[in-house]
């Protein structure tokens, strides 16, 4: 009798799992915006892992309802629509460049980012490029110490290690001085940020919010959609954006990764207003009691003395368009002479890969650099498979060997560049919340290109002959990783 009841229970569980898989399969195919590759990948997971497939889907596969995010993010747009309309009209009249040759030459790209992302163009910026974590954090801490009104700081990862505690200590001192300090961190990325450190930060007068916190113990049903942005705005006059997170490993103190090679920007000029707007929207999406409203001090007029053109573009699962991806594609298709790409994870879709092949086959000098260290095994092998597929088209591929390469940069024709948080993979393009600076300036483009060339001396060039010698186990790892790449 007991055995019969056990069999009934098992059968009920199996039927329930099967029905759940059918429901999720229906949702994936008919109700969510997905690529064909992503649909097939999730269907394979649900079919071949019937007992755990729906759990994996709950954790990793659910898409955010865009309407929900729009409700979270509604905030006065501080005249944004008017600015965008004015700039689009100026583009039509050819009255837009203020002497910037790159803006005239790449006006279609400027228009695309304006139209799709409301990424208004600023032309009076000055910036500093960082490729080393020590330099970046030395300057950031110095800027924090000189803050007069407020500090808005947002990172995907903040660790409770030496660097993390040092940064929190500097922020706490400013909060005690009466400076407004607001810190937004990602709940998953900053899971090692200790509660006692946050408690102390708040006791000192700081305000902290986590992005998409878990409502259940030990599990976060929105773990697949993370805020990967790294933004700092100080007094509305200085802004930071780029790839560095906060932790000892990002200044080269990790035994696993060694030296951490990244790219980050310090901006002075009106582009800081765009970073400020992005921070306010993100902050208000998570804060229920301490919303930021439009104040003139948050958007001051800044006389940086600079002449660099910048658009700040953001993307995320709340958007209808993959704006940063489109920006990358527009840059690649516009290149006439050279393309330089650095990305720790290189798992774009086939159309993206084809755009790179087309550029290379058309005579453009295409160079891609990826790390030779394995941050995430499946991602590493999928990246290797993708970059190797470009070799026969004439693309130059380099494996960075001097630690871990985390830089996300794209430079074309010594004229236009992009630096930010978005990797060249499906996760950054469609799942995570990202932010990039698109920069129209020869000097900046050449500096980033030179940084790439310097890194070549610390890298190994991958050849078709070398790649062909890989063993059966490597081929198997690549195959499995490639199959899973749409959901990595």
UniProtKB/Swiss-Prot annotation:
One Pfam family cited in the UniProt record for this chain: PLDc_2
InterPro entries: Cardiolipin_synth_Firmi, Cardiolipin_synthase, CLS_N, PLD-like_dom, PLipase_D/transphosphatidylase
Transmembrane segments: 8-28, 39-59
Catalytic residues in the record: 228, 230, 235, 406, 408, 413
Swiss-Prot/TrEMBL keywords: Cell membrane, Lipid biosynthesis, Lipid metabolism, Membrane, Phospholipid biosynthesis, Phospholipid metabolism, Repeat, Transferase, Transmembrane, Transmembrane helix
Domain of life: Bacteria
Signal peptide range: none
EC annotation from Swiss-Prot or TrEMBL: 2.7.8.-
Cellular component annotations (GO), alphabetically ordered: plasma membrane
SMART domains given in the database record: PLDc
Entry membrane topology: Multi-pass membrane protein
Record localization: Cell membrane
Chain ranges of the PLD phosphodiesterase domain: 223-250, 401-428
Chief location bin: membrane
Reaction equation(s) it catalyzes: 2 a 1,2-diacyl-sn-glycero-3-phospho-(1'-sn-glycerol) = a cardiolipin + glycerol
GO BP: cardiolipin biosynthetic process
UniProt-listed SUPFAM superfamilies: Phospholipase D/nuclease
GO MF annotation list: cardiolipin synthase activity
Family annotation (PANTHER family): CARDIOLIPIN SYNTHASE, PHOSPHOLIPASE D
Similarity remark: Belongs to the phospholipase D family. Cardiolipin synthase subfamily.
The protein's role, per its UniProt record: Catalyzes the reversible phosphatidyl group transfer from one phosphatidylglycerol molecule to another to form cardiolipin (CL) (diphosphatidylglycerol) and glycerol.
Designated name of the protein: Cardiolipin synthase 2
Organism of derivation: Staphylococcus epidermidis (strain ATCC 35984 / DSM 28319 / BCRC 17069 / CCUG 31568 / BM 3577 / RP62A)
């Amino acid at each position: 009798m007991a055995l019969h009841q056990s069999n009934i229970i098992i059968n009920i569980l199996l039927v329930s799992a099967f029905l759940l898989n059918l429901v999720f399969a229906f949702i994936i195919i008919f109700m969510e915006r997905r690529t064909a590759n992503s649909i097939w990948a999730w269907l394979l997971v649900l079919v071949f892992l019937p007992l755990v497939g729906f759990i994996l889907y709950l954790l990793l596969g659910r898409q955010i309802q865009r309407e929900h995010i729009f409700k979270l993010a509604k905030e006065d747009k501080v005249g944004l629509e008017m600015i965008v309309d004015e700039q689009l009209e100026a583009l039509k009249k050819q009255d837009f460049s203020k002497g910037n040759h790159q803006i005239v030459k790449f006006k279609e790209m400027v228009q695309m980012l304006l139209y799709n992302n409301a990424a208004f163009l600023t032309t009076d910026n000055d910036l500093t490029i960082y490729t080393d974590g020590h330099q970046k954090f030395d300057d950031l801490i110095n800027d924090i110490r000189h803050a007069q009104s407020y500090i808005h700081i947002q990172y995907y990862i903040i660790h409770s290690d030496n660097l993390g505690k040092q940064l929190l200590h500097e922020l706490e001192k400013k909060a005690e001085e009466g400076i407004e300090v607001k810190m937004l961190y990602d709940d998953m990325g900053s899971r090692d940020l200790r509660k006692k450190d946050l408690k102390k930060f708040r006791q000192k007068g700081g305000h902290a919010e986590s992005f998409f916190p878990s409502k259940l113990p030990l599990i976060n049903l929105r773990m697949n959609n993370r805020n990967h942005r790294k933004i700092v705005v100080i007094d509305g006059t200085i802004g930071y954006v780029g790839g560095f997170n906060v932790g000892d490993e990002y200044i080269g103190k990790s035994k696993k990764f060694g030296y951490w090679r990244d790219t980050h920007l310090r901006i002075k000029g009106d582009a800081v207003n765009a970073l400020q707007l992005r921070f306010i929207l993100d902050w208000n999406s998570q804060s229920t009691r301490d919303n930021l409203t439009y104040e003139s001090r948050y958007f001051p007029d800044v006389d940086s003395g600079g002449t660099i053109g910048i658009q700040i573009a953001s993307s995320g699962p709340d958007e209808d368009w993959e704006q940063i991806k489109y920006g990358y594609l527009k840059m690649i298709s516009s290149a006439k002479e050279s393309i330089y790409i650095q990305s720790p994870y290189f798992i774009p879709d086939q159309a993206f890969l084809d755009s790179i092949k087309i550029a290379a086959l058309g005579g453009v000098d295409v160079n891609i650099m990826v790390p030779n260290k394995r941050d995430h095994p499946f991602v590493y092998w999928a990246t290797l498979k993708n970059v190797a597929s470009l070799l026969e088209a004439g693309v130059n591929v380099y494996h960075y060997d001097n630690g871990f390469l985390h830089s996300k940069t794209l430079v074309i024709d010594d004229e236009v560049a992009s630096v930010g948080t978005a990797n060249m993979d499906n996760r950054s393009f469609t799942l995570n919340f990202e932010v990039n600076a698109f920069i129209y300036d020869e000097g900046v483009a050449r500096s980033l290109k030179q940084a790439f060339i310097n890194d070549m001396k610390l890298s190994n060039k991958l050849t078709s002959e070398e790649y062909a010698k890989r063993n059966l186990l490597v081929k198997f790892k690549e195959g499995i990783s490639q199959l899973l790449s749409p959901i990595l």
